[in-house]
Amino acid sequence: MVLSKYLDLPQHGAVLAEYIWIDAHFNIRSKCKTLDKKPTSIEDLPEWNFDGSSTDQAPGHDSDIYLRPAAIYPDPFRRGDNIIVLAECWNNDGTPNKFNHRHECAKLMSAHEKEVIWFGIEQEYTMFDESDNPVGWPKGGFPAPQGPYYCGVGTGKVFARDVVEAHYRACLYSGINISGINAEVMPSQWEYQVGPCEGISMADELWMSRYLLHRVAEEFGIKISFHPKPLQGDWNGAGCHTNVSTKSMREPGGMKHIEAAIEKLAARHKEHIAVYGEDNDMRLTGRHETGSIGSFSSGVANRGCSIRIPRSVAKEGYGYFEDRRPASNIDPYLVTGIMTETICGSIPDADMVEETKRGEEEGF
């Protein structure tokens, strides 16, 4: 309420552009720049820079990292003509920063544009209060066992719905293709879905939706966790189930293309697991609606498999499949990139496994 009267003040033609980027630890950073007019395209936005030594993206003696605008979204917090700018990180020698995985992913998406690959990602997350207690949980104790919370309704069954609703509206305002929300199996855990999105826009929109979630949660004094197993014990983990289809899969007779894709995924199980999120071994145990991290499996309507084919898809003979292995803390550029590489084919100047290793190397 205190801030609202200032947000209503005229800006006299100025436009505020909040540049956001991904740091060395898959955290989101941002800073704001004043523009003298509203940009009509990415090309109208200036390149900017930041201190990469403060985000573990560059050494102190050569710390400038450049922000190259990649996508523009309306700003639901400042509103008006103000915008949020998703930016890629580049080094001063003209090479992509080693934590800039968007660049490699975009190469693959462009090379396989004719496949018209669609993704839909189910982002799960857990909410904690300022004392790091799960929202709604008894202080120093535990709620009743899992059962009544999934898609629950009513006090004691769902928690922090106001945060979820605010985030939903913020995404819609910003043009994020958010397709739904639901309370999850563990209390204080929620899910939202983004998609279907084509190509590189999937990862762009998921990162933007995460930024919006953190910003909304700030206003409620709530911390957002994307850890795949935030609480030990008989509680579900958190994933980023990734739904995938190509044009040929979505057409009548597409099941043969889905089955061919699953065979390719089986052959690269270890490579995919390597990019499917840190601490994913704590989640992929074969329990709590997951498959085992050490083996690949697939099945119709089976949520204990690596790859699930929805019952409706099996019945109709075409559609999409769901990869249930990705953890909630994935970098979607790595996941959608390696998925495209595996099912559509590799290209000479991009390798998502090597791209992952590049980000894990010591030094700059």
From Swiss-Prot:
The UniProt record lists the keyword Nucleotide-binding: yes
Domain GS beta-grasp span(s) in chain numbering: 15-94
GO MF annotations, alphabetized: ATP binding; glutamine synthetase activity
Keywords on record: ATP-binding, Cytoplasm, Ligase, Nucleotide-binding
Domain GS catalytic per the UniProt entry, residue ranges: 101-364
EC number from the UniProt entry: 6.3.1.2
Reaction it catalyzes: L-glutamate + NH4(+) + ATP = L-glutamine + ADP + phosphate + H(+)
The protein, known as: Glutamine synthetase
Gene name, Swiss-Prot/TrEMBL: GLN1
